[in-house]
């Protein structure tokens, strides 16, 4: 358990109750709870949606490290195009109504997806491709 706590940067906070943790720490604790049984599949529904920008970026790094080290299958729902490109090997674009998979885009960027990768033309191209799909729906 101590390795898991360390992997999400919560060492020293093990004895606090959830309401005593910040929002980012609560998200990390929830991630730790989900990982304790070493799942082969991890389902994440907007795991970074309610976090401030700094905490969001730190947890993105934690999730990338987890994926690179443990290799679980991760299905993550997000409304952030940037987050989808940064965190995914494949992005499934879902239609507004009904919710059907319209397009699957394979993201062929190197791991880890650090600031250098995010500043690359390839990253921008993937974001533009996904934005064009949403523009076709009239939602952007």
What label would you give each PLM region?
Residues 1-13, 65:
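Conserved ABC ATPase "signature" region
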Residues 22-28:
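ABC ATPase nucleotide-binding domain "signature motif"
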Residues 96-126:
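Conserved beta-strand-loop-alpha-helix hinge in the C-terminal portion
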